[in-house]
């Protein structure tokens, strides 16, 4: 019995000693008082970015939050974001990898979970110069327009069917199919879901792999922050090995199909898998890196665009004035006898402002993935010890009344008054990050979101379900790394163009 008491007392004593040492040696940012062992884990509310923003109101724009024994520093304004992402970028460019992230990424052999160093620089160069180059994005544009027009076709068929006339439509389902098919076609050259919504055999396996990966990662969540608890939550080596083998088996099969197709045709297509296989020797890319990069694209692109568009549509239904103004611009530029293409974007400034304003108020990833300090560094006059994690609260930065007029108001006109970049150059608006770890696919995400919004608004009018006022729409968020609406948006849809403009425009590339 005495031994059972000694162990937890010793652990608590060690933790208190370590915390005291950190506080005496370093001038740490202020924050809520941590509890022994667990730190602030039990004080954090489910929607973390809102919780951290509330704490910033009490303690200031830079705060310390302890996840168990790990110091996490949260910054919540644009000046501090600039320090983290520009002035001290290289010192804060490493990545904290949980045990599950380490397994999924083969210890950082991909891009997202790689530490800053020669490997990261190499694979980022591949992404920037090869995978997401303007030339490749333009070559793959027909895929995006195919999937967006397929969505329009699907929404039209749903809302004009006899049994659905006048009823609300659950938009998330249609947005999710676009995002899913778009990213799998870009990455793998595969459309796993057909026009009837039926998923093929490889698609079923792909979806199962994604869901199993999420399940495995979630099973270790608490133990990641409290190392001495890991004996209670052991890493299931067998389960992770089985998952990795399953993922690799599917990916290798797709890679083999593309290799064989290149041999027969004598040339490569523009899909990411073809590009990586073609560039393998030039950049000395291992198979682990190719597989890791492909799954990075899937992970980063499968949900985020659909989430952004759902939030934007919710705001447009709540703000009919803005919806009407976008439609007037679309009618003026495109008319009522053709459909929009990405070539029209430059003539649709208000649509682009709506896209920006939605991403300002509702960034799909409201907390940046943590940047790990690879050396001791000062931010905002406080010490950030080596090994600490630094998070930028993108959501709080974009709602800061010190830099935004009426920050809680959905007002796209603000971007007509001042052109604000959202690809990492203006630290007030950071939906895609900034600095060495800025998202290389930012332009792809912007183009797809603007295309989806433009088509939905050009083809249809959107109103709340019968009996609901616009202001009654639930604008709360679900907890999680990405921010779904707590209540999926439902709306009554009315077509506004001639019926022949609601057909899918297929692209076989």
UniProtKB/Swiss-Prot annotation:
Segments crossing the lipid bilayer: 2-21
Major subcellular location class: membrane
Enzyme nomenclature, EC number: 1.14.-.-
GO terms under cellular component: membrane
GO function terms (MF aspect): heme binding; iron ion binding; oxidoreductase activity, acting on paired donors, with incorporation or reduction of molecular oxygen, NAD(P)H as one donor, and incorporation of one atom of oxygen
Keyword Metal-binding attributed: yes
Protein's recorded name: Cytochrome P450 98A2
Family: Belongs to the cytochrome P450 family.
Lineage: Eukaryota, Viridiplantae, Streptophyta, Embryophyta, Tracheophyta
Pfam families, per database record: p450
Subcellular location: Membrane
Required cofactor names: heme
